[in-house]
Every structure is written in C-alpha cells, then in structure tokens.
From Swiss-Prot:
Family designation: Belongs to the IQD family.
Feature: compositional bias, Polar residues: 273-308, 373-387
A Gene Ontology cellular-component term: nuclear envelope
Compositionally biased region (Low complexity): 310-327
Protein name stated in the entry: Protein IQ-DOMAIN 5
Bias (Basic and acidic residues): 355-371, 412-422
Swiss-Prot/TrEMBL GO biological process terms: anisotropic cell growth; intracellular signal transduction; leaf pavement cell development; microtubule-based process; protein localization to cortical microtubule cytoskeleton; regulation of cellulose biosynthetic process; regulation of microtubule cytoskeleton organization
Subunit comment: Binds to multiple calmodulin (CaM) in the presence of Ca(2+) and CaM-like proteins.
Length: 422
C-alpha cells in the first residue's frame, strides 16, 4: 500500500499541477481571445507538454515503487494511459473543430472588413477625383478666358495700329500730294524760272493783242465774213485757229506758277495809273460800236477739242492766214482801239507795245514764291459781254457806262496783270 499510496499522491499532485497549468493556459487563452475580435470560448491545449509531464511522473513513481510493484503498476498505468489518450484525442478533435469554426468566422469578418474598407476608400477616392476634376475644369475655363482676352486685346491692338498706320499713310500721301501740286519740276534757279515764265506771259499777251487786232480788222473788212461766222464752220482757218490761239494764250498748266509772281508785282503799278488816265474817251466809244465777234469764238470753245501744244514764245501759223491785208493807214486806229479794249477789260490793265527785252525788270520779287499766269479766258468772256452791252446802250447811258469804266479803271491800277504788263 505504501507504494500505491505514493503513486496516488503523485497522481493527485500531478493533476493539481496540471489544473494550475491548465488554468494559467486558460487565462492566457482568454486574454488572447479577448484581444482577438472579442472571443471567449477559445481553448489552447499543449499536448506535448502534457505528455512529457506525464512521462516524468511515471518514471518517478516507477523509481520510487521499486521493482516489486512494477507488475501491478504497469497494468494499472496501461489502463489509465489508454483512458487519458482517448480523452486527449477527443479534446484535440474538439479543439480542431472549434478552432476551424473560429478561423472561418474570423475569415468572414476579415472579408467583410475588407469589403467595407474598399467601399469607404472607393467613395473617398471617387469624391476626391470629382473634386479634382471640378478644380481642373475651373482651371481650364480660367485659362481659356485668359487666352481669349489676350487674343482679343491683341486683335484690338493690331486693329488700332493698322488704323493708325493707315491714317498716317493717308496723311503722308496727302502731304506728298500737296508738295507735288506746288512743286516746280523745271531745272534751273528761281531767277531763271521766273524769267522763263515772264517771257511766256509776254508772249501770251502778244498773242492776245494780235488776235484782238485781227478781229478788229475782220470787222472792218466787211459784213460778209461776219455772216460766215454765224454758224459753226470748222473748215475756215480763222475759226479754229482763233479758238486754239485763245486756248494757248490761257495756258492753264502755268497758272499756279504765276499767281504768286503777280501778287508780288502788285506794288509796282503806280506808273500804270498815269497811262490809264490819259486814254481819250473817244476811243472807248469806238470800242462800244464793235460787233460781238469775240463772243462767237468763246461759244465755239465749248465744242472744239484737241489742244495744240506749242512754245510760249512762238505764234501759230493760223494767225497769219486769218489776218487780212489792210493798209498802214488803218493800222494805227486799230491799235488805239486795241489799247482801249485791253484797258476796258475787268481783269487787265494797259499793256505796253515794247519788246520784252527792252522792259526793265524789278529784282524785288521773293525767290521762294511761285508764279502763275492770269486766266485770260475769263477776261475774254467778260470783254465780249461788255461789248454787247455797250453796243445796245443809248448815248446817255453810254456816258454813264464810260464814267463807271473810268472809275473801275482807277480801281484796277493795282491789278497785278496791268502792273506786270505796264
């Protein structure tokens, strides 16, 4: 009994130690399970440690009991071991099944958690992506507006610059046109140009005197020639050449060069006043009896075309063909009538019959101003109208006209044409 009692005590002590160990393990397992998803029913069982402890206890008991009791102990230990091994196998199976259940539950929880995290993260990512896209759209709109504004400003600036350049170009062209209109393209100094223009003016005056002289002699020759002039007859030489000579005497292309020179010569007409006052009134009466032949020539000028270009110092051959042969006795009163006719013009003064080379030229003209030729076409028209009026007036009215013409002649003493030709 002593050996068996010790064996029982050893077995009881072993069970207590196993219980204490198992309780500690259970506490450890409970703490572990609490930390893992709040689980309470998980149990961990270390089978190898239990087997080692059991074998140690068996060896101790076998050493204590001795050889005498070995047979009885072997039989009893074999039965206990079989029972314990069955319990261990059953516990192992239970633990494996329970652990599989817990693992499957944890796996399901993890899968749900992963799905929840994926949903949350996907929602957050989609929300952040939407915010980013809105920001990008706003930035793109702002950039588009800025670029459109820059393009608009560039176009406005370009249009303004183009308008400014166009206005500047138009202004430059206008200035160049003005310069070209007042520009004298002839070669030579100012004095030479003025001398040439003066020669042309004197030649034009000579041509006018010659035409007036020819017209007076045509009137004195007879009335047949005047009746022939009543219609348009371009076959007659005197008809066309008289108009051409009058047109060449005007010289419209030189008017702009001689205007300034005639203004400068307005101060030199004091000597012309004496000559105009000495003209007798009888000569003025003879002019009033002349027929309206110059009016016929001025009326044809609107129908004739084809200007004839010739030099300023030479006369046309038509003058010689249109002038009839008369006696020297009749030439002197014709010249006097011509002088009266020239003096009675509204825009012309008394003209001298001397050679242009014999006249004295005044050097007081400005070298920078330009010369121009007077428009003799207008003076011829006004002359013809006055001649018609003078032919129709009565003797009483002729006196009034003569007095008015004398007053007008005094006023025209300062006329640049008369001063230049004096």
């Amino acid at each position: 009994m002593g050996a068996s009692g010790r064996w029982i005590k050893a077995l009881v002590g072993f069970t207590k130690s196993d219980k204490s160990r198992s309780s500690k393990k259970d506490e450890n397992v409970k703490v572990a399970t609490k930390s893992r998803f709040g689980r309470k029913n998980s149990v961990d069982f270390d089978f190898e440690k239990f087997q080692d402890g059991f074998e140690d206890s068996n060896t101790r008991s076998m050493v204590d009991t001795g050889v005498s009791t070995s047979t009885s102990l072997q039989s009893y230990g074999g039965v206990a071991y079989d029972e314990q091994s069955r319990e261990n196998r059953a516990a192992t199976r239970i633990q494996t099944a329970y652990r599989g259940f817990l693992a499957r539950r944890a796996l399901r929880a993890l899968k749900g958690l992963v799905r929840l995290q994926a949903l949350v993260r996907g929602h957050a990512v989609r929300k952040q992506a939407a915010v980013t896209l809105r920001c990008m759209q706003a930035l793109v709109r702002v950039q588009a507006r800025v670029r459109a504004r820059r393009v608009r400003l560039a176009l406005e600036l370009e249009s303004e610059t183009s308008q400014q350049t166009l206005q500047q170009q138009l202004a430059d062209e206008a200035r160049v046109r003005e310069i070209e209109e007042g520009w004298c393209d002839s070669i030579g100094s100012v004095e030479q140009i003025q001398a040439k223009l003066l020669k042309r003016q004197e030649a034009a005056a000579k041509r006018e005197r010659a035409m007036a002289y020819a017209l007076t002699h045509q009137w004195q020759a007879g009335t047949r020639l005047l009746s022939a002039h009543s219609g348009f007859q371009p076959d007659k030489n005197n008809w066309g050449w008289n108009w051409l000579e009058r047109w060449m005497a005007v010289r419209p292309w030189e008017n702009r060069f001689l205007d300034s020179n005639l203004r400068d010569d307005a101060k030199l007409g004091e000597n012309g006043m004496e000559q105009s006052e000495n003209v007798p009134k009888t000569q003025i009466k003879s002019v009033s009896k002349m027929p309206n032949t110059s009016n016929l020539v001025s009326g044809v000028s609107s129908q004739m075309t084809g200007p004839c270009q010739s030099d300023g110092d030479s006369s046309s051959p038509g003058i010689s063909s249109s002038i009839p042969v008369v006696s020297k006795a009749k030439s002197k009163p014709a010249k006097d009538d011509l002088a009266v006719e020239v003096n009675s013009r509204p825009g012309a003064g008394p003209r001298s019959h001397s050679n242009p080379k014999e006249r004295s030229r005044e050097p007081n003209r400005s070298s920078k101003e330009r010369l121009s030729l007077p428009n003799s076409g207008k003076s011829l028209g006004s002359q013809s109208t006055k001649a018609n009026r003078a032919g129709k007036l009565t003797p009483a009215s002729q006196k009034v006209v003569e007095e008015k013409s004398a007053q007008n002649q005094r006023r025209r003493n300062s006329d640049p044409i008369k001063q230049r030709l004096a």
